[in-house]
């Protein structure tokens, strides 16, 4: 497996990963990808990918992307689900279904944390449903609960 920085050419793959992240529960209906990506809150996570404050890493196997951790700065006027402040990028995490539960998400998270620190960020945030198994992975790499909204936690990690 190779891990590399995300770039503007990864836009389509990141949209696919955003769909996977947004529809993480296998019991939920699988709406068409474009229907999900067109939701106003989801558009905040992908429109104009590559703008200042965007970053992330991609996992590849034999040159084919299989997972991503990417982050974006949000504003108080248009926050993401895990918004903490305008200086803390919010992280999204997704791995292709066939490659899940193999440690790829944690490896990608740690790589993204290093990259974000090198870019001068001091913290990263995220939002996770309380019943999402990924919550335990986030805790293992250092994220801590800083808020709760309905059935989701806002988590933060110091870099």
Predicted regions and their residues:
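A short beta-loop-alpha structural element at the N-terminal edge
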Residues: 2-16
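Conserved GNAT-fold acetyl-CoA-binding loop/helix
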Residues: 22-46
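A short helix-loop-beta-strand connector motif used in the catalytic cores of GNAT acetyltransferases and
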Residues: 43-58
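Conserved acyl-donor/pantetheine-binding loop and adjacent beta-alpha core of acyl/acetyltransferases
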Residues: 52, 60-92
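A short, internal acetyl-CoA/4′-phosphopantetheine-binding micro-motif in the GNAT/acyltransferase core
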Residues: 60, 90-101, 128
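Conserved acetyl-CoA-binding loop-helix of GNAT-fold acetyltransferases
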Residues: 101-114, 118, 139-140
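Conserved GNAT acetyl-CoA-binding A-motif
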Residues: 116-129
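Conserved acetyl-CoA-binding loop of GNAT-fold acetyltransferases
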Residues: 139-149
